């Protein structure tokens, strides 16, 4: 008799930060460990965390979550598979699969991985047989490479700098997407976000609640609205301030090292 798998999903920034304590509560239960046969799948949401905190901050906390969960799983002898809810545009975690898997923490792939492919990219990736074969081979090759040749562990200096950068980036990002800001007035004026909710192309409503504010707008229409005007802003908003901080004399050498030696950052 096959049991229904339990796959926790961590999406927002708070979810990512609390993932370790939540999973520790589960893993500490002996009946739970036996129930899952010491195998756990964990899903990481990319769209919501990026909309919540900005791309840089979300990316670093997604990285940290995996690192922390792997350490925890080692203690309880649990085999972890990460399910990455990413793909499509850069604002939703999309990008070449080789670079994607190289940028994960060491030993987080380990011969297996799950990744979503959003509806809008299915046709372009798998609609033509030779292209589908190429894409699937790319996935296999990327998994093998990330398993046999994992990326290096980040240096303490790198971690310290990226922590500071993510805080600066998040504050800048959240300051911009404040409901009262000129930025949001700009978003409402130049993007077709209201029209998107009337299109029958999604599996869910464009808003979580029937309230006309940015917080209630789902992450996918948020990115999609910007994409319609060819302004891929969710992929970089807030990052400029963080890079300006890291480019100062104090951190410049560390920043150059990160770019050259750390696949997560480059």
What are these regions (language model features)?
Residues 37-41, 77, 110:
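Active-site lining segments that contact anionic ligands and/or coordinate catalytic metals
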Residues 45-48, 56-66, 73, 78, ...:
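Acidic, glycine-enriched catalytic cores built around paired aspartates
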Residues 17-19, 52-53, 92, 123-125:
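Short helix/loop capping segments that flank catalytic or ligand/cofactor-binding pockets
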Residues 3, 27-36, 101-119:
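Acidic, His- and aromatic-enriched active-site or binding-groove loops in soluble protein domains
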Residues 11, 83-98:
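Conserved phosphate/anionic-ligand binding catalytic regions in large, soluble enzymes, centered on
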Residues 18-24, 92-100:
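Catalytic cores of alpha/beta
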Residues 1-48, 260-266:
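Catalytic alpha/beta active-site cores
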Residues 21, 25-28, 61-71:
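Alpha-helical scaffolding segments of alpha/beta enzyme cores, especially the outer helices
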């Amino acid at each position: 008799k096959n049991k229904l798998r339990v796959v926790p999903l961590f999406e927002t920034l708070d979810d990512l930060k609390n993932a370790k304590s939540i999973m520790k509560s589960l893993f500490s239960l002996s009946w739970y460990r036996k129930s899952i046969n010491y195998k756990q799948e964990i899903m990481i949401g990319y769209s919501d965390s990026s909309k919540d905190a900005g791309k840089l901050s979300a990316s670093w906390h997604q990285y940290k979550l995996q690192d922390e969960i792997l350490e925890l799983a080692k203690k309880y002898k649990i085999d972890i598979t990460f399910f990455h809810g990413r793909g499509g545009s850069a604002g939703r975690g999309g990008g070449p699969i080789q670079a994607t898997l190289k940028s994960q923490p060491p030993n987080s792939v380990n011969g297996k991985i799950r990744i979503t492919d959003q509806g809008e990219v299915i046709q372009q990736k798998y609609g033509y047989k030779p292209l589908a074969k190429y894409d699937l081979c790319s996935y296999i090759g990327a998994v093998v490479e990330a398993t046999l040749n994992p990326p290096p562990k980040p240096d303490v200096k790198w971690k310290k700098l990226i922590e500071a950068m993510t805080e600066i980036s998040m504050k800048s990002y959240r300051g911009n997407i404040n409901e009262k800001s000129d930025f949001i007035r700009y978003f409402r004026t130049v993007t077709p976000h209201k029209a998107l909710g009337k299109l029958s192309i999604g599996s869910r409503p464009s808003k979580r609640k029937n309230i006309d504010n940015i917080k209630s707008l789902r992450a996918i229409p948020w990115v999609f609205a910007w994409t319609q005007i060819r302004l891929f802003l969710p992929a970089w908003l807030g990052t400029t301030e963080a890079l300006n901080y890291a480019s100062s004399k104090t951190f410049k050498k560390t920043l150059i090292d990160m770019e050259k030696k750390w696949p997560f950052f480059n």
